[in-house]
Amino acid sequence: MAVGLGPLPALHPVPGFELGISSAGIKRPGRKDVVVMRCAEGSSVAGVFTLNAFCAAPVILAKQRVQGTVRYLLTNTGNANAGTGEPGLVAARRTCEALAQLTGVDASAVLPYSTGVIGEPLPVEKIEGALQAALDDLSVDNWAAAATGIMTTDTLPKGASRQFTHDGVTITVTGISKGAGMIRPNMATMLGYIATDAKVSQSVLQDLIRDGANKSFNRLTIDGDTSTNDCCMLIATGQADLPEITEAKGLLFEALKKAVFDVCMEVAQAIVRDGEGATKFVTVEVNGGGNHQECLDVGYAVAHSPLIKTALFASDPNWGRILAAVGRAGVPDLDVSKIDVFLGGVCIASQGCRATTYTEEQGSAVMAEAEITIRIELGRGDCSETIWTTDLSHEYVKINAEYRT
């Protein structure tokens, strides 16, 4: 079940960015599993990619090509084309070449993306056979269909859109994402595509998506695994009648930054809300750190703990598990007598011990909620970080045990 995630909001079309969807039947016949995106000529494209050393063949190619001239993004679901060695690279190149031949662009102007089962050969012929139908379907209004087309174990499509006005010109930022499992920071089993009609230099665009992803996609964790295939792409088509943004300053840049960050945050949190088998959406706030890294270390120790995640699923306020996770986070010279821990607004531990005012009934009431905040005050400094995660349910085990069957 998705926690607090409803139907897609209105996804505003982005001038100069079209999407087309078709079926290659990669995992099952008739399923829409190929998405082609076309960028207007002169668009800037930037991206961030998985840090997994076993990164997939399409990731390797996309990273090589992203700073060049990009006209098309080609996505398939049902097959990750990861762990496939040189044949996987050959297969990824073949799909790009097939699309290039149909559209009259150079193959280097096509960026490939794949998601699905790892270690199986990419069914190149099936993808090639679906390309013309996807091209015939290209439309600026196809964001919702594309959000469905990139899904794997997701239960709902994910998207967000923002608009703002500058000097009388409306700028649009729209994005979609997919992901429900193998979610771990530094990009997870996640694909994200965000487009705007602003005109932005490639260097500024790259910094923008890096910073936006760092505060959103890179603060998610569902199961602690980092995928081989992740990426988040930001495309600026330059169709809006405004000057090019060439520096990370000024009113136009700040307005665009806010819109991009808002879209990143919304589609990133949607991934957690739709986490495989999730019944709880959990925010882990760590305040009072001496530096940001120790806040993250504590936050991830809590968010990754199977004992805490199963307690969340059971609505069991087992606060000792939270203290244990904080203590093993590896923060040097941690003074536990300064640590306070809260469940929602309830103080469960004060100065490293059970709070004198805390009752089990208070904790149980918070843990029964669908959305829970665990707040940890370290008392060491002024740094803070926030991470989003889920509980760990029977359904998560079932989904992943049956993934290839």
Swiss-Prot record:
Q: Which UniProt keywords apply?
A: Acyltransferase, Amino-acid biosynthesis, Arginine biosynthesis, Autocatalytic cleavage, Cytoplasm, Multifunctional enzyme, Transferase
- Alphabetical list of Pfam families matching this protein: ArgJ (PF01960)
The record places the active site at 189
State the InterPro entries in the record: Arg_biosynth_ArgJ (IPR002813), ArgJ-like_dom_sf (IPR016117), ArgJ_beta_C (IPR042195)
Q: Which GO terms describe its molecular function?
A: glutamate N-acetyltransferase activity; L-glutamate N-acetyltransferase activity
User: Which CDD domains does this UniProt record tie to the protein?
Assistant: OAT
Localization of this protein: Cytoplasm
Sites marked Cleavage: 188-189
EC number, UniProt record: 2.3.1.35, 2.3.1.1
In this chain's numbering, which residues are marked as the site (Involved in the stabilization of negative charge on the oxyanion by the formation of the oxyanion hole)?
Answer: 115-116
Tell me the SUPFAM superfamilies matching this sequence. DmpA/ArgJ-like (SSF56266)
State the reactions this protein catalyses: N(2)-acetyl-L-ornithine + L-glutamate = N-acetyl-L-glutamate + L-ornithine; L-glutamate + acetyl-CoA = N-acetyl-L-glutamate + CoA + H(+)
HAMAP family reported for this sequence? ArgJ (MF_01106)
- What does the record give as the function of this protein? Catalyzes two activities which are involved in the cyclic version of arginine biosynthesis: the synthesis of N-acetylglutamate from glutamate and acetyl-CoA as the acetyl donor, and of ornithine by transacetylation between N(2)-acetylornithine and glutamate.
What the record says about family reads: Belongs to the ArgJ family.
* Name of this protein: Arginine biosynthesis bifunctional protein ArgJ
Q: Which organism is it from?
A: Pseudomonas syringae pv. tomato (strain ATCC BAA-871 / DC3000)
Protein's gene = argJ
